[in-house]
Amino acid sequence: MRSPHRDAIRTARGLVVKVGTTALTTPSGMFDAGRLAGLAEAVERRMKAGSDVVIVSSGAIAAGIEPLGLSRRPKDLATKQAAASVGQVALVNSWSAAFARYGRTVGQVLLTAHDISMRVQHTNAQRTLDRLRALHAVAIVNENDTVATNEIRFGDNDRLSALVAHLVGADALVLLSDIDGLYDCDPRKTADATFIPEVSGPADLDGVVAGRSSHLGTGGMASKVSAALLAADAGVPVLLAPAADAATALADASVGTVFAARPARLSARRFWVRYAAEATGALTLDAGAVRAVVRQRRSLLAAGITAVSGRFCGGDVVELRAPDAAMVARGVVAYDASELATMVGRSTSELPGELRRPVVHADDLVAVSAKQAKQV
């Protein structure tokens, strides 16, 4: 299969490769260092061809199952975190040993959703990853499961890999798992499931039924599709391919499903506002303000706000909602929640001079379509 979108992945200089838990385990569920070594070999070939590669690797919890004498993946949070603590050591040591065969050094980068959502930590993570690449080390990124709470079910690193792809300015993202691409329904349950080789946008997914997670990983098809749409909307093409064909996927992108990127890449700040930052509150707008913000790309003024919810400070990211409560945009708010509550519905001329700035400036606004809102 050849297409301009596959060619973009085949020729990408900067690449993020996400390796799922099921790609690193045996059929019985035990961590398999041999499988990891095979994936490292495929990545090494791509790097020898001139690409810079960052690896987002799941598998810490699975790698901790056997050393702790567990018979299966734990279900309670404390045991998951204990398994991740033990397994992360084995995981990064395996990557280190695999790349040492090629004279390469690896660096471990553990992140949480909170790290990505906070602007300072977000920037520091970006600098660290950039520096590792400049020093020719292979960055191995994983979610820090030992301190994560709800994030431990973040999607088997699918969403994290999409965020990292934009964070490092990657030219493409490759999601490797135990599936060979996207189908209109689960091919394991439906004999006539139709393979979807290319997705140009969310509209192509109307009617597609995504499967649930595997027994070892936490990232089902819905998680992978959501991550792929996130990256593609931010300007990064994505290949969803089977880990068993990693060598082919990384060599010529001729397998799996490709998600076409939007023509213009989001700026780092707009991407952070749109996808990475945690919204700490919400503003409900009247219909006129929704039109101004979404269609005309204008700044939000206090007169168009009908309600304020949440506890936030100036500089935080908030959701902008239509009268029916549907999110229509996200943006950086200029005022504290308590201050803004006194401004609701008032025209600029009614406000004192220090409160006449836009509530959310157009430069700090990112509109969100109904389909996109489901990906946040």
From Swiss-Prot:
Cystine links in this protein are none
Record carries keyword Nucleotide-binding = yes
Residues annotated as binding ATP:
K18, S177, D178, T218, G219, G220, M221, A222, S223, K224
The answer on whether this UniProt entry bears the keyword Cytoplasm reads yes
**Which domain of life does the protein's organism represent?**
Bacteria
Per UniProt, where does substrate bind? Answer: S58, D145, N157
Q: Which EC number applies?
A: 2.7.2.11
Protein's GO biological process: L-proline biosynthetic process
| Catalytic activity from the UniProt record | L-glutamate + ATP = L-glutamyl 5-phosphate + ADP
**Where does it localize?**
Cytoplasm
Per UniProt, the enzyme's principal EC class comes to transferase
Limits of the PUA domain? 280-358
Q: Which GO terms describe its cellular component?
A: cytosol
Q: What keywords tag this UniProt record?
A: Amino-acid biosynthesis, ATP-binding, Cytoplasm, Kinase, Nucleotide-binding, Proline biosynthesis, Transferase
Checking Pfam families in the record gives:
AA_kinase, PUA
GO molecular function terms attached to this record: ATP binding; glutamate 5-kinase activity; RNA binding
Known InterPro entries for this protein? AceGlu_kinase-like_sf (IPR036393), Asp/Glu/Uridylate_kinase (IPR001048), G5K_ProB (IPR041739), Glu/AcGlu_kinase (IPR001057), Glu_5kinase (IPR011529), Glu_5kinase/COase_Synthase (IPR005715), Glutamate_5-kinase_CS (IPR019797), PUA (IPR002478)
NCBIfam families tied to this protein: proB
Database matches in HAMAP family = ProB
Function noted in UniProt:
Catalyzes the transfer of a phosphate group to glutamate to form L-glutamate 5-phosphate.
Q: Which family does it belong to?
A: Belongs to the glutamate 5-kinase family.
Name listed for the protein in its UniProt record: Glutamate 5-kinase
Taxonomic lineage of the native organism: Bacteria, Bacillati, Actinomycetota, Actinomycetes, Mycobacteriales
